[in-house]
From Swiss-Prot:
Binding site for carbamoyl phosphate: 57-58, 107, 135, 138, 268-269
Binding site for L-aspartate: 86, 168, 229
Organism: Thermococcus onnurineus (strain NA1)
Pathway terms, separated by semicolons: Pyrimidine metabolism; UMP biosynthesis via de novo pathway; (S)-dihydroorotate from bicarbonate: step 2/3
Lineage, uppermost ranks: Archaea, Methanobacteriati, Methanobacteriota, Thermococci, Thermococcales
Protein name: Aspartate carbamoyltransferase catalytic subunit
């Protein structure tokens, strides 16, 4: 597989071999970072970060990743300060920005925006989230986090909790987990169940899938509990949001019958779905998960720029 110039738009564009290759490169980069703190693979290269939606971790970890590779960063964190406010099209914005950069990272509220950007641009485009559709780099760092914690992904029982209808992180993650020998527990309110087509695809690929509303009854079965925020901004109807707001909270009482080895993950930001008391337990893995974004995104940037090899 030729990585130089490759777009990263959807988990569906990856094979299991692709995923394992990225995780291997990320692990190697993390080891080198721990020794040196700063690398020079991308010296002279420029990353453009185009964030049409709010972001803390994704934007900053991409910027950190590029700086740690020795490259530079330009971009914006809000469309309000760009010519989009004057009516400029997404295509024209992309064609303009690629004149200044070597790789583009884009987050946009419209599903399919990253794919459109990739079709227009002649430089690599990396999807940092397009509406409620896909978030492939989050998925890769999630898999990396799990593998670093357990030494494997195969054989694990993994629960996805919360907004499974609109949550792009769980859509991408579920699709990627289908490459592995895992058992999935989909825990959500009835109104926020995983889209039917994703569940059907998982089962067609041989994944054992359980759908439930019962968090406490499911926790003892799990090796990983992946918690998501119920995303108010994704709901077309405020009343629909109010019906499911605060449906679940992971706290020490909920975890009383959990395996000692259970790890809790969250793509963040959290609101109240994980109580802060959980932060002090051995179960909490979400801040290590945040760190994983740096080596994984370093790997993706380096590979697509052609400055890293296997």
């Amino acid at each position: 597989m030729e990585w130089k110039g490759r777009d990263v738009i959807s988990v569906r564009d990856f094979s299991k071999e692709d995923i394992e290759f990225v995780l291997k490169i990320a692990e190697r980069l993390e080891e080198r970072l721990n020794k040196k703190g700063h690398l020079e693979y991308a010296r002279g290269k420029i990353l453009a970060t185009l964030f049409f939606e709010p972001s803390t971790r994704t934007r900053l970890s991409f910027e950190s990743a590029m700086h740690r590779l020795g490259g530079s960063v330009i971009g914006f964190s809000s469309a309000a300060s760009t010519s989009v406010k004057k009516g400029e099209s997404l295509a024209d914005t992309i064609k303009t920005v690629e004149q200044y950069s070597d790789v583009i990272v884009i987050r946009h509220p419209m599903e399919g925006a990253a794919r459109l950007a990739a079709e227009v641009a002649e430089i690599p485009v990396i999807n940092a989230g397009d509406g409620s559709n896909q978030h492939p780099t989050q998925t890769l760092l999630d898999l990396y986090t799990i593998k670093r914690a357990f030494g494997r992904i195969d054989g694990l029982r993994i629960g996805l909790l919360g907004d499974l209808k609109y949550g792009r992180t769980v859509h991408s993650l579920a699709e990627a987990l289908a490459f592995y020998d895992v058992e999935l527990y989909l825990i959500s309110p009835e109104l926020l169940r995983m889209p039917k087509h994703i569940v059907e695809e998982l089962r067609e690929k041989g994944v054992k899938v359980h759908e439930t509303t019962d968090l406490e009854g499911t926790v003892p079965e799990l090796d990983v509990l992946y918690v998501t925020r119920i995303q108010r901004e994704r709901f077309p109807d405020e009343q629909e949001y109010l019906k499911v707001k605060g449906s679940y909270q992971v706290n020490c009482a909920v975890l009383k019958n959990a395996k000692e080895s259970l790890k809790i993950m969250h793509p963040l930001p959290r609101v109240d779905e994980i109580h802060p008391e959980v932060d002090r337990t051995p179960h909490a893995l979400y801040f290590r998960q945040v760190f994983s974004g740096v080596p994984v995104r370093m790997a993706l940037l380096g590979l697509t720029l052609g400055v890293l090899e296997g």
